[in-house]
Amino acid sequence: MANHRGGSGNFAEDRERASEAGKKGGQHSGGNFKNDPQRASEAGKKGGKSSHGKSDN
């Protein structure tokens, strides 16, 4: 396991970089929820429902 390949894309060993990438991703997202809180709310609900496959409880 000492041979890590493609270090540039490995966030597991570089949490700070992963955090930066997350912030950048949020800023550059195509759908701007700042101007449309209603849409942001709907997206949140959809995301919660469709995550983790089957949870029909």
UniProtKB/Swiss-Prot annotation:
Residue ranges, compositional bias (Basic residues): 46-57
Lineage: Bacteria, Pseudomonadati, Pseudomonadota, Gammaproteobacteria, Enterobacterales
A Pfam entry, by short name: KGG
Gene Ontology BP terms: cell adhesion involved in single-species biofilm formation
Family named by the database record: Belongs to the con-10 family.
Biased composition (Basic and acidic residues): 12-23, 36-45
Region (Disordered), start-end ranges: 1-57
The protein's name in its UniProt record: Uncharacterized protein YmdF
Organism domain of life: Bacteria
Gene: ymdF
